[in-house]
A protein has these predicted regions:
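Residues forming the flavin
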Residues: 2-67, 74-554
Length: 554
């Protein structure tokens, strides 16, 4: 894909982003736009013919007594306008805005059969969508269910503890992100991110995801977005198959593959493997095919829950509850100790979800609806795990990484009573000198896992290694110094958070093909090339571009 300006004068001149417009909470849109106009005027720019609109919005809560909203504004000049000097814009704290198109030059090599995309998470979805949009008629498969059936399976597990290992919080339409906060924030600097957001908006996501600096969709809305995207893939000539797990494949002399699936054999011209970070049997199958995989560092830990109103007050003080602020968010980290500790996937007004995908394990994750108005707020508190912490299994460090996760998940299952209840401990007990005992039952903050009905008091160190527990204690105390009250004794810890990222990477080359395996394209978070919805979607786009640039449409 070439991300080129539509016209030279557009790139250089016709639009600018005016940054750093700080206003009090409650300021009107008109006031924000007026400040942008004033900023342009101070640079000697005539604003009479310019069009101004809000571009990005963020909350600056570094000072609780003076919380500010910080905006960027897009200023656009009409046709025929002389435009803006980049030198002048730089002095103003502004920058040129480049209206970018997604332009892909198609290859000419014949594709011997339709492309197969394995996995319906963000990477697989966006890869299949772009392939379908460009006329390649992909086949998209997932081991799990369609959205509605998947929601029913997850609800059933929460209600009665019957786990469907093929359709759950990890597997099915939309991937693990379907049961999350639907965060779209990413740290990658790639112009494709804007294309991802715009596509999600067209598929039914709220329009404010374009404006917000920390956009989120919410699990309730994201489910509809995923279904709309799948429908669009079919409308564009693609095919979607559920309950279709990839168990193996054969390569043929003519360059085609036969994918061995639970729905039978599928002939394809290439395979995009976007399995998600929990497809452990897929990793093992790929190892058996002599593909090159490597273990990578991960993080493990717990979910911490506070009352949402407490967290709002901790971060926003007297401004807590203001409609311009919403439920408070945080991201905390400390790398000064023995291991890095950080919060991850913070879910304001959300719940802790039962995220197991294998029998006899307990895994936790977080989820919020669009409104973020639940009783509790939660986040992972995770500790860095090094590859040196893994013990090889059958001579494989990749299998050792998976075994490391499984040991913790199995320990959490046993600590919870072996009925898919979650082991919980108050922060007070965990930080106490007798942290190996869970003495105090939850009182002020109640666990939200499986509706709050299935939990058991158990010390965190029954689930996690001592070196992880020591780092968690260090991290909680550090975070409490940054956000007073974070380590309040009544807060609840639920174990175990183990699926923060993929424990392995499927090696690929500059052509995006797996090393030594032309025609197989590892993709997304499960392949080790992304972390989160937006970056996984971007990686799916990149892989689709690689396919499109190499082959002509079917």
């Amino acid at each position: 894909m070439d991300l080129n300006p539509r016209a030279a004068e557009n790139a250089r001149c016709r639009a600018a982003i005016v940054e750093g417009i700080s206003v009090p909470v409650g300021a009107s849109e008109a006031e924000v736009l007026a400040r942008a106009e004033q900023k342009m005027k101070r640079g000697g720019i005539s604003v009479g013919s310019l069009h101004f609109r809000l571009y990005k919005k963020s909350v600056d809560a570094r000072k609780r007594e003076d919380i500010r909203l910080v905006y960027s504004v897009l200023a656009t000049a009409p046709e025929g306008h002389r435009g803006f000097s980049e030198e002048v814009l730089a002095r103003l704290g502004a920058k040129p805005y480049r209206d970018l198109d997604l332009q892909i030059e198609k290859g000419t090599a014949p594709l011997p059969a339709r492309p197969l995309v394995v996995g319906m998470g963000p990477a697989g979805l966006f890869c299949a969508y772009l392939l379908a949009k460009e006329g390649y008629a992909p086949i998209l498969i997932d081991r799990g269910d369609a959205v509605a059936d998947r929601v029913a399976a997850v609800d059933g597990f929460c209600r009665d503890g019957r786990l469907d290992t093929e359709s759950n919080v990890q597997f099915g339409a939309g991937g693990a992100g379907t049961f999350s906060d639907g965060k779209l924030l990413t740290r990658i600097n790639d112009a494709r991110c804007a294309w991802v957001l715009e596509t999600l908006r067209r598929m039914g996501a709220p329009s404010d995801i374009i404006l917000q600096a920390k956009p989120h969709v919410g699990t309730d809305v994201l489910r509809h977005v995923v279904q709309n995207m799948l429908d669009s893939i079919c409308d564009l000539g693609g095919e979607v198959i559920y309950r279709c797990r990839l168990d193996g494949f054969d390569r043929h002399p003519d360059g085609t593959f036969t994918a061995k699936t639970t729905k039978g054999d599928i002939l394809c011209g290439l395979m995009v493997i976007a399995p998600g970070h929990s497809a452990r049997d897929t990793y093992k199958m790929l190892l058996g095919k002599q593909m090159m995989l490597e273990a990578k560092p991960i993080s493990v830990g717990v979910r911490i829950e506070h009352l949402r109103r407490d967290m709002d007050t901790m971060l926003y003080g007297s401004m807590a509850g203001h409609p311009d602020l919403g439920a408070a968010e945080y991201h905390l980290s400390d790398t000064k100790g023995e291991r890095g500790v950080y919060t991850f996937c913070m879910c304001p007004g959300g719940e802790v979800v039962a995220a197991a995908s294998e029998e006899g394990t307990v895994v936790v994750n977080g989820m919020s609806c669009r409104a973020r108005d639940g009783l509790n707020s939660n986040s992972a508190v995770a500790v860095s795990v090094r590859t040196s912490d893994y013990e090889p299994v059958d001579g494989s460090l990749v299998l050792g990484a998976i075994a490391y996760q499984r040991r913790i998940e199995r320990a959490a299952y046993l600590a919870g009573g072996a009925d898919y209840s979650v082991p919980v401990q108050t922060v007070g007990d965990f930080l106490d000198g007798a942290g190996d005992r869970a003495i105090h039952a939850p009182t002020r903050v109640m666990p939200s896992y499986r509706g709050g009905a299935y939990y058991r008091l158990a010390p965190v160190n029954q689930t996690l290694p001592d070196y992880i527990c020591d780092s968690l204690r260090y991290g909680l105390r550090s975070f409490d110094r940054k956000v007073k009250g974070f380590a309040m004794p009544e807060a609840i810890l639920s174990a175990a958070e183990t699926r923060t990222s993929a424990p392995v990477r499927i090696l690929r080359g500059a052509d995006y093909c797996a090393v030594g395996c032309p025609g197989i394209y590892p993709c997304g978070e499960g392949a080790g090339y992304a972390g989160g919805i937006t970056s996984a979607a971007v990686d799916g786009i990149k892989v689709a571009e690689a396919v499109i640039s190499a082959y002509g449409p079917n």
